[in-house]
Structures are given as C-alpha cells and as structure tokens.
Amino acid sequence: MTRRINDTFLRACRGEKTAYVPVWYMRQAGRSQPEYRALKEKYSLFEITHQPELCAYVTRLPVEQYGVDAAILYKDIMTPLPAIGVDVEIRGGVGPVIANPIRSLHDVERLGEIDPEHDVPYVLETIRLLVNEQLDVPLIGFAGAPFTLASYMIEGGPSKNYHKTKAFMYAEPKAWFALMDKLAEMTIRYVKAQIQAGASAVQIFDSWVGAVNADDYRTFIKPAMARIFAALREEGAPLIMFGVGASHLAHEWNDLPLDVIGLDWRLSIREARRRGITKAIQGNLDPAVLLAPWDVIEERVKRILDEGMEQPGYIFNLGHGIFPDVQPATLKRLTAFIHDYTSTK
C-alpha cells in the first residue's frame, strides 16, 4: 500500500496556497527531547549519526511527538568534512574543534574530494530508511554553507568575531577562493546524493555569515553559493537558504536560484517583503520566546503568522535552533496552535 505524504510544506516552498501554514523547527530533532538526551548518555553525536537506525529514530521523533509538517535529517554540518581530510571532533560544551586548521593555499590544496556513497553511506542509508519505511511528511536534507564551514576550518573551532577567517579572506584571496571552490564542490556532491537518496527538500545553513557585510558577501561568498544552488536546481527539490544575523543579506539571497529564504527574528516578514524579497519565506520566531509563558508565545506567534499569511509561500519556523531547555509540550502545543489558527484564516 502506498503511503500518503503530507505535502503542505513542499507546496508552501513552491509559493502555492496551502490549507494551513506548515511548520517545522530548526533543531527539532534532539536537544530538548528526553529520549534524545538518554541516547546522548550512551553515544556521541557522531556515533548516533553513523548508525542509520538510531539516526532515523531521532529524526522522526519530532514528527511523531509534535505533529510537524516536515522532518529534518539528524546530522551535523561537520559530517562531510572528514571525507575531504579535515580532522574534526565535536567536544561537549565547545562544539566542533579542528585539529588541522587552514593557514595557507597549500593547506587548501591538500583537501580531497567527497564520494558520498563511499564516504558517508550512513547518511544516505538513513535517508532511504526514513523515506521508504517511516515518514509520512517530507524529509529535509541539509548541509553547511562554505563560509560557515570555512570559518571552523580556519579558526580551528567556534569564534566570537571570525577575525582569522576574515583576515584570511582579505589577505589570501587566491587561497580563499580555492577553499570556496573546494567546499562548493563538496556541498554539491553531498547534497545531490541526499536528494537522490530521497530527501524532498534541502536547507543550506550559513550560521555565521552574518559576520560579513553585503559587499564582502557579493565578492567573496556569493559566487560559491550561486554555483551550489545552480547545480542543486537540476535535482528539482525545493532549496532553502538560512543564515543567522544576516538580514542585510536577504536581498542577495533573493537573486540566487533557490525557493525559500529563512529569516531570523531581526527582520520582520512584512519588512522583508517590503524590501523586495519575492521568494517564499520561512521563519522567524525568536527561540527565546519559547521559554516565556504561553500567552506571550501565542501573541508573538499570531503576529508572525498574520504577516506570513499576507502572501502565499510561507512556512513557520524559528529564527534559529531550539534551546535545550524548551519543553517538548510547548512545541506540541505550538504546532497544534499554528495549524488551528491558520486553517481558519
């Protein structure tokens, strides 16, 4: 018997009218869920992601518990980097730490290429397992964008100001563009493999791109992003772009061959459209609001939904990932509220 897939999210990605506003949450898989925390007591992040059955379980939990309209693959943006020769470790309380940071053109040239079926088969097996057997909503694949990946590779880990990254970009443009090319090619291969394995849509996360101004984005970063989205466009899956603190770059993304622009809470949906954003929009509740009393959450969410519904092509989400101390019951209640409130409009 063929399973019926709820395609509300996909139709919103394409700018179509929907019966209600679809919703999913960045970092919905993990972090705030007690079942996930129990797993993390036994396994590291990479140990979970290397086991398709465990990874599929974590991915589908929020669909079953919250009733969201899309699942997002449980992985880390660092997942493909070891395949090209980056020695990365996820340290608790710190984040990704790179043992061999990039310092020169020679360091860039030593990076290899990814063969997804050979290097990350567990990613593709997780996708196949989910779409063939377990999900009745679309599965979103994802990857980190070149700037954010490069920032970890150059800084050696998380950074507050990305000064090493930007200094490298300004002082070593030949090496910088070579690195962008390497990471763009890796991203294209990695994401195409996810789509071909069954992912219905893809989100590219540029978590730290808000650190650069629009002129530098156009010069040093946008060419790689244009290459990535043009190549992924061939696969036919909706493409989503998201960056944190990057409202000043939304008009740059609007020029790219993608379908959805994810906004954080710093730019309202109405203002984004006033500035000429013509893509479908995703966002943009400040995740900190989810720690407030329900009446505050409801008031803020209504305001966002009312703006989002002014035009077709809107998906509710947060402006960044869920905080670990958000209660699962709050997310379940929020999802039901969004569905009920928007289905009567």
From Swiss-Prot:
Site positions per UniProt: Transition state stabilizer: D76
Database matches in CDD domains: URO-D
InterPro entries for the chain: UROD/MetE-like_sf, Uroporphyrinogen_deCO2ase_HemE, Uroporphyrinogen_deCOase
Keywords on record: Cytoplasm, Decarboxylase, Lyase, Porphyrin biosynthesis
Binding site for substrate: R27, Q28, A29, G30, R31, F46, D76, Y152, S207, H320
Cellular component aspect of the GO annotation: cytosol
Annotated transmembrane regions: none
Reactions catalysed according to its record: uroporphyrinogen III + 4 H(+) = coproporphyrinogen III + 4 CO2
Biological pathway: Porphyrin-containing compound metabolism; protoporphyrin-IX biosynthesis; coproporphyrinogen-III from 5-aminolevulinate: step 4/4
UniProt keyword annotation of Lyase present: yes
Alphabetized GO MF terms: uroporphyrinogen decarboxylase activity
BP-aspect Gene Ontology terms: protoporphyrinogen IX biosynthetic process
EC number from the UniProt entry: 4.1.1.37
Cellular location(s): Cytoplasm
Main localization (coarse): cytoplasm
UniProt key word Cytoplasm: yes
Signal peptide: none
NCBIfam families referenced in this protein's UniProt entry, alphabetically: hemE
Family, per entry: Belongs to the uroporphyrinogen decarboxylase family.
Subunit structure, as described in the record: Homodimer.
The protein's role, per its UniProt record: Catalyzes the decarboxylation of four acetate groups of uroporphyrinogen-III to yield coproporphyrinogen-III.
HAMAP family: URO_D
Protein name: Uroporphyrinogen decarboxylase
